[in-house]
């Protein structure tokens, strides 16, 4: 029973970490990364469709993304979607390829992005701690129902805390990497 709780806790914390990584991957660093355009939705036959389903996005060089649209008729719609996104990008099309040059980040913008990333990291830690709280509640319920002893409860909570500490540390490591990436120019 306790092992199932630990496995479930580990799985849910991994999902929280992945969600955090996905959120900060969308933060622009000044380097061209295809994941930057992941959140863009293009109007396709009346419904918003993720850009990834309509085009191939690759980093052409350190400061340029190349978007190759599968359907020529969508070039203007894709260009408009990139332009109207809140990323501050200015795409230009050449044939079936749309080039998206990334303007250099100002020092002030870098600081703002670091604040955003730190906020995301805090949300990630909160999610991990919420998973810990749920696991501890399940363990306390087992104790209350007399399915485990107090010693087993204490041991299980210590193990859950170790798992939590590991994931909080991972969130901090990802945050440190992203901050370093933002400050490198």
Curated annotation (Swiss-Prot):
Which GO cellular component terms are attached? Answer: cytosol
Give the UniProt keywords, A-Z. Answer: Cytoplasm, Protein biosynthesis
Any one GO MF annotation of this record: ribosomal large subunit binding
* One Pfam family here: RRF
Task: List the InterPro entries hit by this protein, alphabetically.
Answer: Ribosome_recyc_fac, Ribosome_recyc_fac_dom, RRF_sf
User: Chief location of this protein?
Assistant: cytoplasm
A GO BP annotation: cytoplasmic translational termination
Disulfide topology: none
* CDD domains named among the record's database cross-references: RRF
Write down the NCBIfam families for this protein, in alphabetical order.
frr
- What does this chain do? Responsible for the release of ribosomes from messenger RNA at the termination of protein biosynthesis. May increase the efficiency of translation by recycling ribosomes from one round of translation to another.
Q: Which family does it belong to?
A: Belongs to the RRF family.
Name of the protein this chain belongs to: Ribosome-recycling factor
Look up and give the organism this protein is from.
Pasteurella multocida (strain Pm70)
What gene name does this entry carry? frr
